[in-house]
Amino acid sequence: RAQRMGRPDYAIKCFTEALAIQDDFETMSYLSQVYIQTNALSEAHELLERMAKLEPEHTSTFLTLANVCYLQEDYQAMAKAAQKAIEIEEGNAMAHYLLGRAKQGMDDGIMSIAHLTKAIVLKDDFTEARLLRAEALTKMKQYNEAMEDIDAILAQDADDESALLLRGKIKEATGDAGAAEADYCHVTELNPFNEQGFLYLGQLYIEQKKLPEAIALFDEAIELNPNFAQAYHERGRAKLLNGDKDGSVEDTKIALELNPKEVQAFNGQYGNQSNERQPNVLGL
């Protein structure tokens, strides 16, 4: 009841006290859900390991464990959990998808594609698996094969933002900047809060030396989300290339204050006025 009422702290206390009296799989399952909801990932991981030992034939336990490992960026453990789920239930498309995602996290593109393909064979409309396979193929510069997956996704949903962004990256990589710009613009029109759309479009403008357009675009992005650290970062880069050193320094300072973890990524970015593209969530 405490869980349903939005009192996770009290729910954790109740479940923990119940488990101190007796190990119960169902209670453990409820507690693991609360841990995940409250981002207590280490506790969730440990509890799911206990659940797996208590009842080792539950596929769902290993799938949940694999998802927790993904959030922890522990791809080795994620692969192990997904592989265990496959051993229990070979035909589970989600298990193959999670193993493919783990392999991608381990930079094993070939095996990632193999398991994602298995997931798609098992579930033809598995959009997430197709998108991830398209990303893996794009990393390997297999653009035609990647486009087959993207086309399949867009045939189901013409406004799938992730597929449109990836198509834009492929168009950009293959020299069709106009088509890339159209895809990025379409995403920002569909969803003005899609940060990646603004980043890709602004980065494209910077590469094309359309610096006033890039700055204006990032002005808009920051107006929509004043805590958008990467937008400050990219606007600062555009300002420096446009001759506004003071404005660039100010934007860089704000970006670092908003996201201190990115200090290393920012280092040296402006000193050489580099026009290199920044990494993005698709890893491209």
Task: Please identify what each model-predicted range represents.
Residues 4-5, 37-38, 71, 105-106, ...:
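Register position in tetratricopeptide repeats
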